[in-house]
Amino acid sequence: MTGPRLPDGFAVQVDRRVKVLGEGAALLGGSPTRLLRLAPTAQNMLSGGRLEVHDAVSAQLARTLLDATVAHPRPASGPSHLDVTVVVPVRDNASGLHRLMAALRGLRVIVVDDGSAIPVQPSDFSGMHCDVQVLRHTRSNGPAAARNTGLASCETDFVAFLDSDVVPKRGWLEALLGHFCDPAVALVAPRIVGLHNADNIVARYESVRSSLDLGVREAPVVPHGTVSYVPSAAIICRRSALVEVGGFDETMHSGEDVDLCWRLVESGARLRYEPIALVAHDHRTNLRAWFHRKAFYGTSAAPLTVRHPGKTSPLVISGWTLMVWLMLGVGSFFGYLASLAAAVFAGTRIARALSVVETEPKEVAVVAAHGLWSSALQLCSAICRHYWPIAMIAAVLFRRARHAVLVAAVVDGVVDWVTRRGNADDDTKPVGLLTHIVLKRLDDIAYGTGLWTGVVRERHLGALKPQVRS
C-alpha cells in the first residue's frame, strides 16, 4: 500500500514491542504480526528506532513502517481548531448536551436534534461562548442519519463527531489534529474513559473494560488488528474523505461506526487511535441496561459480515497452532503426542520463515511460544464469547468439553483482569479477580446473545465463521 508523501519534519517511532532481528536486518511485529526486512540503507536511517522525514527516500521508508504497523507517527504539527466543526447528534438528552457544550468553548458546533420530544433551541446555548447552529429532524432517523445531516452542513476541512453523553478533556483536540499532517489520514479517535467516579461494581468494571475504551496503547485502525475499529461516540474525520465514501450508513442502527472505519480503510485511507487524547463517556452502570447494551453491540456483527465478508471472524488462527490446542484438549496420550508433533511442525515453519535473517534458536522459540500463547487466548475468548451457546451444550454432554470450557473461562478471565487493571484511574477502586471473571462472563454472554440474534435475523453465518490460515 502506498500513499501521499509525508511532510518534512514528520517522524515515526518503531513500536517498543517490535522485535529487532538479525542486528537490525528485520523487524517482527505489528498488528497483524509480520516480518519486515530492511535494506542496509533503511537500517542506517533508523536511529534508536526513530526516523525523521527529510527527503523522498526517508518519506517512503516512514510510510512503509507505518503501513506495516511496526511504527507509530510522531507528527510535527497539525491543523488549527478553526479548521474543525463539531457535530453533536442528540435525542432527549438536554442535560448531557449542555454538559458537553460547556466543554466546547470557542469551537464551531452543529447540534442535530434527532426528533427530541422537547426540541433543542439555539437560545439554549446563550452564554456558551461557541458558535452554535441547530438542525432538527421532526422524527428520529437514528444517530447515523443525524451525523450525516451535520456533515452536509459542514464547510470546514475537518469534522468532529461527539455524542451528547461525552465530555472531552483538556488537550483532546490538539492531540488528535496533529495526525492530520499525514495527508493519508482520514480519521483519528481518542481514548474513551468513564465520566463519573465508579460507585458500584458494574461501574468499576466498566472503568477498565468498557466496550468503548480501546486501551492505553496507540495503534493504527485496521481489521483484525489490536484496534480493528473505533466508536463514533468521539472521532475526528477529514471531511473530504468522509464525503467520498458516502458518510455513515443510515440503514445500520448498530455498528455503523465499524462499517465506516472499514469502508475508509478499503478506500485506501489511514485511521489512527490516539489514547493520549481523552474523552469521558457517561457509561451505563445499571446491570440490566449494561447487559442489554452489550447484547445490542453484538447484533451488529452479522450485518457487518454481509457488508464486509471475512472481517468479523471471531477467530483468525494458523491451522497448525489450532491443531496443537485441539489435540491437547483431547486429553489422551495420542492427543498429547499429536499436539507435540503439531507444535514442532509449527515451530519448524516459523524457523524457516525467519531464516531470511540471522536469528538464534532462542529467538525462534520465543516467537513460536508467543504465537501459541496468542492463539490459546483467541480460542479461550471465542469459546466464552462468540461460541458460548455451543460451548455450554458441549459442556453439558461431554466431561472433557466441560473441563475445556472451564479452563477457557478461567484463563480468559484471569488474563483479562491482569491486562486491564492498568486502564483504571487512580481514584477507582480495583475490581477483584473473582468479580471481574464473573462480570466478564456476563459481558461475553450478553455480546454472544446479540451476535446469535443477529445471525438468525440476517440468516448469515459469516459472523461465526473462523479464519483458519495455512
Curated annotation (Swiss-Prot):
Cellular component annotations (GO), alphabetically ordered: plasma membrane
EC class (word): transferase
PANTHER family: GLYCOSYLTRANSFERASE, PRE-MYCOFACTOCIN GLYCOSYLTRANSFERASE
Cellular localisation: Cell membrane
Assigned protein family: Belongs to the glycosyltransferase 2 family.
GO molecular function: glycosyltransferase activity
Primary residence: membrane
Membrane-related topology note: Single-pass membrane protein
Keyword Cell membrane attributed: yes
Keywords: Cell membrane, Glycosyltransferase, Membrane, Transferase, Transmembrane, Transmembrane helix
Function: Involved in the biosynthesis of the enzyme cofactor mycofactocin (MFT). Acts as a glycosyltransferase that catalyzes the oligoglycosylation of pre-mycofactocin (PMFT), adding up to nine beta-1,4-linked glucose residues. Is required for the in vivo ethanol assimilation in M.smegmatis.
InterPro entries assigned: Glyco_trans_2-like, MftF, Nucleotide-diphossugar_trans
Effect of loss of the gene: Cells lacking this gene lose the ability to utilize ethanol as the sole growth substrate. Glycosylated mycofactocins are not detected in this mutant, as well as PMFT and PMFTH(2).
Transmembrane parts of this sequence: 315-335
Protein name: Pre-mycofactocin glycosyltransferase
Top-level taxon of the source organism: Bacteria
EC assignment: 2.4.1.-
